[in-house]
A protein has these predicted regions:
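A short, structured loop/turn motif at beta-sheet edges
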Residues: 10-14, 65-70, 92-102, 146
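Helix-adjacent hinge/juxtasegments
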Residues: 60-67, 73-81
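Hydrophobic ligand-binding cavity/cleft-lining segments
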Residues: 1-42, 149-150
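Short, surface-exposed coil-to-beta transition loops
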Residues: 2-4, 58-62, 85-90
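Beta-strand/loop substructures that line and gate deep hydrophobic ligand-binding cavities in soluble
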Residues: 79-134, 139, 150
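Hydrophobic pocket/interface hotspot
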Residues: 16-20, 26, 50, 64, ...
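Generic structural detector for well-ordered beta-strands
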Residues: 6-10, 37, 51, 63, ...
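Short beta-strand segments that buttress and anchor functional surface loops
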Residues: 48-55, 74-80
């Protein structure tokens, strides 16, 4: 199953991409997470793992499979909630004007067990859709405020 949410953010894409991948700042804006870090002081790049804990207490370790600043960062789950057989996500940053960016969060997942997939995937999809909208709205508010001259 796939869900995707996008917003137009009044900040240039280079800053948005950098801020979105800055784990030291992540919990300031990310309303979905209570913990997020790259182990051993690593910096985001292809092959690097990331640890995240959601507000519900679920944890996921994902691995960067694409990292192309300032355009896209993508990960796939290597360990996570047992209800997910597979999970991957991408955050895309498309310049609309020099100071305006379309930010799109897209997630793909497959639920398990297979015999319950017909029930689980729509429920998980609805959950992720609500939280992804909140998460991206929170990022937009934070980034636009952060970009204001001081």
């Amino acid at each position: 199953m796939r869900i995707s949410v996008s917003r137009i953010v009044g900040v240039d894409r280079r800053r948005l991409f950098t801020w979105s991948q800055d784990y030291a700042r992540r919990l300031v804006w990310d309303s979905f997470l209570t913990d997020a870090y790259l182990p051993d002081g690593m910096t985001a790049d292809v092959g690097v793992d990331a640890f995240c804990r959601s507000q519900s207490g679920a944890t996921m370790v994902s691995r960067y499979i694409s990292y192309r600043p300032p355009q896209v960062a993508a990960v796939e789950m290597i360990d996570g909630p047992k209800v997910l057989e597979r999970f991957s996500g991408s955050w895309n940053f498309t310049e609309r004007t020099p100071d305006t960016t379309e930010v799109k969060f897209t997630y793909h997942f497959r639920a398990q067990p297979a015999w319950l997939r017909w029930l689980l995937e729509p429920l998980i999809g609805a959950f992720y859709l609500v939280h992804t909208r909140r998460r991206l709205d929170s990022f937009k508010r934070w980034a636009e405020a952060e970009a204001l001259p001081r």
